[in-house]
Amino acid sequence: MLPEQIERLFEEPPAQYNETHFALFREFKSALNRGEARAAEPDAGSPTGWRVNTWVKKGILLGFRMGAVIDMSVDRARQPFIDKSTYPVRSVTPADGIRIVPGGSSIRDGSFIGRGVVCMPPMFINVGAYVGEGTMIDSHALVGSCAQIGHNCHISAGSQ
């Protein structure tokens, strides 16, 4: 049902967006965070072994359309953060089982980060990314939007 709703919303002009549409987008982003919605996923029936979910890519684009540019800085003088209101930095707690070493790392809301992932600074994980359990994102690595990374991988320093 979520795929069809996102497809319909994608066709709506931004001037028509209302609170129901924003609630749908929040539901979509939550599904991304849980790993239940993926931009691509394994598909044994596909010649490549993968299926691209275009509805997910459309949902991500919707977030950019729906968001206003706002100041989300914690310490504006030291590190300004001005971006779309729909894609803040993801909230992470110890219960998530993710290790984020201090030193300038960011994970954008709308990405799945599996348990046991280690994030070495500085690194960035963008919206729509899926990072499997036990993976290490090493220093100066950029995990792009919609990137699909398996379990127990090492994304080496400087990778993009």
Predicted regions span which residues?
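Terminal amphipathic alpha-helical/low-complexity segments used for targeting or macromolecular assembly
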Residues: 1-98
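Structural signal for interior beta-strand "rungs" in well-ordered beta-sheet cores
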Residues: 94, 99-160
